[in-house]
Every structure is written in C-alpha cells, then in structure tokens.
Amino acid sequence: MGHYRCPNRAGSSDMVMTNTPPSGAMRGFGNENMSFCMEQLMDEAAEALGIDPIDIRLTNAKQVGDTAAMGLRLESTYMADCLKIGAAKFGWKERQGADRSQTGKVRRGYGLATMSHCTGAAPLYLEHSNAMVKFNEDGSVDLIVHPAPVGQHIWGALSQICAEELGIRAEDVHIIGDNTDVTLFEYGSDASRSTYAVGGATLRAARQAKAQLLSWAAEMLDVPVTDLFVKDRIVYFKNDPDKHIPISEVCFEAIYRFDGRATNFFGKQSFEPEWNSPTYGAYFAEVAVNTETGRVTVDRLVTVIDCGTPINPMAVEGQLEGAIQQEIGLALTENYLIKKETGVVETTNFDSYKVPTALDMPKIDIHIVDKPDPKGPFGAKGVGESGTVGVAPAIANAIYNAVGVRMRALPIPPERVLAALAEKNACKPDSEN
C-alpha cells in the first residue's frame, strides 16, 4: 500500500516455528510478494468498476505531503509521470483492447503494475551515515566512507557526488572504504539507501571542505569569498574570469605554509534523514501464453522509474536490468522446494532451481523520469531494489489479459498455468468447452 492512499487498513502477523531453513533478507525484502498481491487486486478492482487500470492507480496515488509507508512525510513522487510515459512508450491504449476470444494455442496478453520502494528505512531502523572529505596537496581528494559495495556501483556514485560539489573530476576522488579501523560508522547497504544516505553525508562533508578551500583562496586572490566558485579544478572570481587559481595551488599553500597557519582542508559530516523519499515506477509487460504447455514467455517490458535525478544514468539502467532479470526468475522459474516431512531443501542446484539466463530475457525499454527529490544528494533517490518489485505483478496481469486466469502464487511455472486453465474450463458450461 506504500504508493496508494488507504487510511482504512490494518494488519496482523504471527510467528510460527517450522522445521524449514531460516529465511533472510534479499533484494526487495518482501515488497515483491506484497506488490504481486496488491497490483493484481488493483486490476481486479478496475475491472469490477469498469475503468482503466491506469486510471484507478492515478486516482488513488499518494501525493507530496502525504504520509509515506515508513510514517514520515513524503517529499517527492512522480508515479503519475511513470504511468503516463510508460503507457505512451508501451502503446497501452492500443494493446489494452486485446481480444479475449483469441484462437490458437498461443495467446498474447498485456499487463501493468506500479511500485514504490523505500529509500532507506527511517524511522524503523537506524538510518545513520557518515563521511569525511580531505583535500591533498595536489588538489585531489580522499573520500573516507564505508558503504558495503554489493555490486551497486556505489563508490562510483559517491565519487561523482563529491567531485560535482568540489568542481573536480571523479577520478580525482580516492575512496578509502575498506578498513573499519580508519573509516567512520556506517549502518550498511540495504533498503536502497546507499546513494541517498551515504551520498547525503558525502555531499555535506564536501561542502564543508569546499568552504575552507574557498576561504583560503579568497585570501590569496584578495577577493570576497562569496564571489568565488570552483570549476574544472580551478577557483574563479566570478567578476573577473581572468582572476583565478588552481585548487592544487591553494591546497599546497595551505599544507606547506611556514608561518604557523598551515592547515589541511577537510569536512566530516553525518546524514540522518527525518523524511522519506521512496522510488516509484511503472512496469508494462507483454507476454505469450502457450495454452497447451502452460509456458509463459515475456516478450517485452517497458519500465519507467522515478528515482529522482540519477547520479549515473548508465549505472541506474544496469541496476534495473539486473533486478528485472532476478524478478523474471521470481515470477516464472525460481521455485524453492522443501520436503514437508523433513524440511530438507530439494532444489539444491541450478539444475533444479532454475534462474533465467540472457537467452530468457525479453526486450527491455527503460526510461528515467529524471526529476529531482528535494532532499536527496543532487536530487537522487535509491534505485537498487526497484527493478525487483513491479515485474511479477505486471506479468501476472498480462497472463490474465491473455487467458483469463488469475495466478495467486509465485512462481508461475507451466504446471500452475495448466492447472488454472483446467479449473477455468471445468467451470464453463459444456456448450462453451
């Protein structure tokens, strides 16, 4: 319910002891399952009301100022943009009228789903990041941070954030992040928080270090500090472009001064948000369902993401493509089987636990809304888990559009599709079979 207005809700949970292996967190952390249920429910409600699935989502979408899923104020949302852009790119209006009375063994269907996923887990968890930025005598910078690099290209993003604020190149930023003896406290890389929280601390630390740099440069140039700016590793006087000084010269002068005023420019800052900026998205899927074998093939996916201003668009697309492949596996092939009598896992290798390969991937069109979040570093929000949330329900809704059966469990292997079709046909009058 994270992206829909729904004041009338309640929930309960039970703890049950089992003889099965313990479960733990993974990419998406339960949101995939909730979204699989919620987004099919939204389609069912739209069908019952006789309205377009897009319209029911737009009508009930949360707006800026509403309370986000974590209980904090929602700072930005462009879910409406995601839906409208996605519908245009996918050709939703043309495809939504697909004939349910298709003949032949292969039936085509089209479905959509929207999603939101947290950018950090405040206030449920400790949401605390720290960073230190230190200038070296050659004008390069040491960035001392400790996010967990789990494949999300976080060090690259942090280098870009730091470099952008300081007016230097990303390659001038040296990350020191693999030794807890010298780094500051860091909560960790989860809940799609690293770019947002660690990036927020990095940006604040860079601003603090830059203020010291500019103060020293103002003295060297004999101009007001408020009239200085940094670009391409040079400090400029805005009223006279010819009056400038390289960052390296300022840093060298400060470090190796012999009059008792020598110093090293650095900034050390923390980031602990008091707001929430979830990522939003819309997924549109085109599938083919073989009614004789039950096999579902995903032929095309259109993904539109509101992740604020992307720090590195290519890395964002890479994150989404990888997450989408994971989600296709969750939706169609990855079946974690446990023997009920013993609790022993039966799918112990990739010959039985089937993950999709590059050959199984559909054509994927990814579009980034690229509108800034007011609280994120340079407008960024998290995106690492967003691709794992909306794909499965979009596929399930497309299956329903193709053959008229609702899939209520994940994954959706051929045998479940055949069973659902058999149940549907058994309920028909003899004249329709």
Language-model region placement:
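Cofactor-binding beta-sheet edge motifs in enzyme active sites
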Residues: 1-81, 88, 97-433
